[in-house]
């Protein structure tokens, strides 16, 4: 993820306090300077970095660590709380009828974000509709229509009209049954007067409940001026940051939030319509510092299980009752794939997103995903009987399956060994009572190790239980 380098740098800085029980002024100053370097290299605005540094320095020197708390954990808690304060609250988006206008420069990801937001609202039980008003960019209508079809949400646009205001007004009429209207507007390569005039006219015509500014994570230091101009024109209520799965540094968008006195609403984390997260400050910073985010993880697990259950006529609860088959394993892997890239999932698990992940080779995630794909191809080459009873698979079947899947016999055997291990684990879970499961979840929340330092937040709570 785009902010991985920032998170790794911050965790490395805090790890320098490992084993210390007290803090000297020199310790604090070194930590503050390292944090400044990390944030500035991530394109966070200089003024914001200085304000954050002053707060961390003052608290680290003035506050006494609670009894039994290490110097590292004390500073970690301070950094966590101050960074949550820095990114601010999430934009208020009640699950009710509303109209949202998206603004931003061309190429910022407005059209993709419109479809993603519509998909997100649909998963919350509302009926959304996207209204495409961009008459400036060739292909805007086709892209929006295709994205909305993939998201399975209502769409309105008129490729034959060159009047964006008329399209917006007609769109509201044609999609009157929708609960949430998301109006996608045109962009330009620069903040031209024509763009601002058009945006103001659309805003006046549709009278939106909220205006969201869509910013590419690569915007850097230019975010502040851009945000100020849009805010002066229509008033910005929140920011959606896109392309956080790329190589941009991402910190510049925080200046836009500060400049407009608004907050972050959504994060775009990939190319698929489902690759969008509602911004939750405590979980976001918790992940950044290697402490996990169990709330976001549980939402992804629930969504992935529901989708797999619908597609495969498979109930995950059956795993706790009978024999764990290769078919069950394949369904589990399908659900994992639906949760998103493996490195993002690891960031949400306390103890894995920090120290353990930082120690892995750069290509470890890609290799793991590739091996999972190999396993899926192998299982697709098996008969129904083999999927239901893998213990009956002998050498001749292994040879046939390897040929049919285009893999080698060793990889087939590796899959069978992996299944045996998972089958043993499932038997252990089947023997657990509710109390055992609750204790295990509590250990996960408190777990960490490596570069951890605390559990991820559940139910909106931070890793320190505030």
UniProtKB/Swiss-Prot annotation:
PANTHER family xref list: SIGNAL RECOGNITION PARTICLE 54K PROTEIN SRP54, SIGNAL RECOGNITION PARTICLE SUBUNIT SRP54
The record's note on its domains: Composed of three domains: the N-terminal N domain, which is responsible for interactions with the ribosome, the central G domain, which binds GTP, and the C-terminal M domain, which binds the RNA and the signal sequence of the RNC.
Keyword Nucleotide-binding: yes
GO biological-process terms attached to the record: SRP-dependent cotranslational protein targeting to membrane
Subcellular location: Cytoplasm
Subunit relationships: Part of the signal recognition particle protein translocation system, which is composed of SRP and FtsY. Archaeal SRP consists of a 7S RNA molecule of 300 nucleotides and two protein subunits: SRP54 and SRP19.
Chain's role: Involved in targeting and insertion of nascent membrane proteins into the cytoplasmic membrane. Binds to the hydrophobic signal sequence of the ribosome-nascent chain (RNC) as it emerges from the ribosomes. The SRP-RNC complex is then targeted to the cytoplasmic membrane where it interacts with the SRP receptor FtsY.
Protein name in UniProt: Signal recognition particle 54 kDa protein
Annotated GTP binding sites: 104-111, 184-188, 242-245
Compositional bias segments (type: Gly residues): 446-466
Keyword DNA damage: no
Enzyme class: hydrolase
Gene designation per UniProt: srp54
Entry keywords, A to Z: Cytoplasm, GTP-binding, Hydrolase, Nucleotide-binding, Ribonucleoprotein, RNA-binding, Signal recognition particle
Organism whose genome encodes this protein: Natronomonas pharaonis (strain ATCC 35678 / DSM 2160 / CIP 103997 / JCM 8858 / NBRC 14720 / NCIMB 2260 / Gabara)
Record family assignment: Belongs to the GTP-binding SRP family. SRP54 subfamily.
UniProt-listed Enzyme Commission number(s): 3.6.5.4
Pfam families in UniProt: SRP54, SRP54_N, SRP_SPB
Gene Ontology CC terms, in alphabetical order: signal recognition particle
Record-linked HAMAP family: SRP54 (MF_00306)
Catalytic activities: GTP + H2O = GDP + phosphate + H(+)
Entry superkingdom: Archaea
Region called Disordered, residue ranges: 444-466
Principal subcellular localisation of the protein: cytoplasm
């Amino acid at each position: 993820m785009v902010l991985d380098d920032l998170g790794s740098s911050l965790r490395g800085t805090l790890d320098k306090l490992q084993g210390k029980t007290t803090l000297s002024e020199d310790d604090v100053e070194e930590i503050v300077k390292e944090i400044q370097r990390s944030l500035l290299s991530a394109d966070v605005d200089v003024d914001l970095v200085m304000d954050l540094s002053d707060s961390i320095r003052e608290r680290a020197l003035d506050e006494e660590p609670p009894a039994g708390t290490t110097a590292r954990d004390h500073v970690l808690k301070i950094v966590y709380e101050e960074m949550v304060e820095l990114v601010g609250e999430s934009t208020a988006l009640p699950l009710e009828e509303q109209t949202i206008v998206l603004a931003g420069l061309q190429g910022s990801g407005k059209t993709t974000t419109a479809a993603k937001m519509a998909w997100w609202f649909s998963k919350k039980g509302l009926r959304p509709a996207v209204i495409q008003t961009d008459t400036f960019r060739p292909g805007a209508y086709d892209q929006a229509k295709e994205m909305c079809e993939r998201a399975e949400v209502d769409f309105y646009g008129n490729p034959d009209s060159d009047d964006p205001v008329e399209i917006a007004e007609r769109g509201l009429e044609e999609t009157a049954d929708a609960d949430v209207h998301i109006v996608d507007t045109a962009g330009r390569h620069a903040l031209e007067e024509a763009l601002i005039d058009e945006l103001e006219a659309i805003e006046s015509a549709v009278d939106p409940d909220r205006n969201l500014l869509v910013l590419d994570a690569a915007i850097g230091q230019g975010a502040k001026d851009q945000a100020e101009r849009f805010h002066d024109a229509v008033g910005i209520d929140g920011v959606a940051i896109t392309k956080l799965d790329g190589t941009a540094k991402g910190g510049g968008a925080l200046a836009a939030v500060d400049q407009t006195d608004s907050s972050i609403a959504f994060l775009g984390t990939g190319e698929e319509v489902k690759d969008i997260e509602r911004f939750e400050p405590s979980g976001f910073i918790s992940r950044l510092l290697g402490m996990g985010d169990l709330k976001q993880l549980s939402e992804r697990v629930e969504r992935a299980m529901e989708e797999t259950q619908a597609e495969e006529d498979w109930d995950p609860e059956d795993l706790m009752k009978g024999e764990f088959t290769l078919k069950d394993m394949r369904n589990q892997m399908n659900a994992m794939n639906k949760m998103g890239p493996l490195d993002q999932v690891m960031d949400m698990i306390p103890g894995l997103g920090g120290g353990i992940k930082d120690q892995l080779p750069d290509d470890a995630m890609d290799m793991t995903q590739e091996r999972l794909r190999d396993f899926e191809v192998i299982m697709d080459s098996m008969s129904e009987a083999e999927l239901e009873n893998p213990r009956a698979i002998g050498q001749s079947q292994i040879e046939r399956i390897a040929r049919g899947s285009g893999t080698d016999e060793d990889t087939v055997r590796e899959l069978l060994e992996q299944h045996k291990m998972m089958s043993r684990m499932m038997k252990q879970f089947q023997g657990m009572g509710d109390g055992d499961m609750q204790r295990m979840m509590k250990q996960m929340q408190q777990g960490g190790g490596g570069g951890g330092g605390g559990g991820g937040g559940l139910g909106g709570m931070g890793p320190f239980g505030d």
